[in-house]
Amino acid sequence: MSTIDVGLQVTESDLFKATGDFLSVLFPDAEITQTQQNQTSMPKGGFISMTPLFLTDLSTSAVNYEHDGISDYGRAELRRVDEWQCQLDFYGDQAQNNATIFSRIARSEFACTWFMENANVLVPLYSGPPRQTSMINGEKQWESRWTLEFHANPLIVVSVPQQFMT
C-alpha cells in the first residue's frame, strides 16, 4: 500500500508558539511554559503555563481545489471552523492581576490585530473568567495560581492529493 502525501498547515506547536508569544508581549517578566512535559520542574517566581484542553469542530469542511491545469494531480485543501481551548495558569504574586489583564485583552481588537500581524495561525475569541486555583507545592507551601480558559479559532488547513481530469 502506498503512502498519501497529507499536509497540515497549522500544528499544535504553532498554536502554542502563537499563544506563548502573545503572553510574552503582555507579561515580559513571566516565564511561559507548556505543561505535560516530562522531567521538567516548575519555574521559580511568576510564570504562566499553557495546557491544551479541546479542539472542537464547529462546522463541516469546506474544500478548495488547487490545480495547475496541466498535470493529472493537484491538491484539495480542507478547511473548517474549529475552536481550540487552552487552559492558562498564572502563578506568583501577580497571578490574579495578570489573569485579569489577559481575560480582558483576549476579547479585544488589540488581540485580534496582534495575532493577525504577528502570529496568523489563530483568531482569539474570548477568555473565560479567572478563578483562584491555589495549589500546594513540593515544599508544602501555598502557591498563588489563577486559571482561565483561552478560546480561539485555529486557522488549520489539511491538504490531500486530488486527481483531475485533464
Model segments located where?
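Small/polar-rich, solvent-exposed N-terminal microdomains that initiate assembly or binding
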Residues: 1-72
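Oligomerization/assembly interface segments of phage tail-like spikes and tubes
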Residues: 78-93, 102, 143-154
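Short, well-structured hydrophobic secondary-structure segments
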Residues: 44, 51, 58-59, 83-98
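Short beta-strand/turn micro-motifs at beta-sheet edges
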Residues: 71-77, 137
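Acidic/histidine-enriched, glycine/proline-rich intrinsically disordered or flexible terminal extensions
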Residues: 158-166
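Acidic-leaning, charged glycine-interspersed low-complexity segments
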Residues: 107-158
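Residues in well-ordered beta-strands of folded domains
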Residues: 49-51, 89, 125, 151
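Short amphipathic alpha-helices in soluble, non-transmembrane regions
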Residues: 100-107, 165
